[in-house]
Regions:
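Carbohydrate-active catalytic/glycan-binding domains of CAZyme proteins
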Residues: 1-175
Length: 175
């Protein structure tokens, strides 16, 4: 078919975005970049995917009612952010809006993955300093509340991704 896939990642390109460059965190000053491919053998040139004006990592993008929602980590060290924020776009490749206010609480969070079930969003993430998983929920992507206390996760779990599988696939995984 005509399916085109987008592969995106965070990296630092030395000398780019000097206004947010610091020596802490190994001098990392990440932005989100992407390539496209139809066959996973040939790839487009690398393009800038998201430049929020701060060090950004761990983006995950999901479709929502005709728009694209990016959950991302603000990796700013000084003053510390280390939280999850949201940006939106009409097209997958952007341009994305400025990142909103943090949706996570007074702890360091990264590696978000999002679900929308029965009209409610849940964003799961790694509370990596606390060595545990966390979650927040929202009906509108604006007002968020903590639901971390409801989680029961395997010990040692780190960044994860939620995706849909069939009952048959589940049975094969369990057995």
């Amino acid at each position: 078919g005509n399916d085109e896939y987008i592969i995106y990642w965070a990296t630092t390109i030395r000398g780019r975005f000097p206004e947010t460059q610091i020596e802490a965190d190994n001098g990392y000053n990440h932005r989100m970049y992407y390539v496209t491919t139809k066959d996973f053998k040939t790839f487009s040139e690398t393009e800038l995917f998201y430049e929020p004006g701060f060090n950004v990592i761990d983006a995950t993008v999901v479709r929502d009612s005709g728009r694209w929602v990016m959950f991302l980590k603000d990796e700013t060290r000084e003053p510390a952010q280390k939280n999850i924020k949201i940006a939106c776009a009409d097209q997958l490749k952007g341009p994305y809006s400025a990142a909103g206010e943090p949706i996570t609480g007074d702890y360091w969070a990264e590696g978000p993955t999002a679900t929308k079930i029965d009209g409610e969003w849940t964003v799961y993430f790694d509370k990596y300093i606390d060595h545990r998983y966390g979650a927040v929920a929202s009906k509108d992507l604006i007002s968020w509340h903590e639901v971390s206390h409801h989680l029961r996760m395997p010990e040692g779990i780190r960044h994860g991704t939620v995706f849909r599988i069939s009952k048959q696939e589940l049975q094969r995984l369990i057995n």
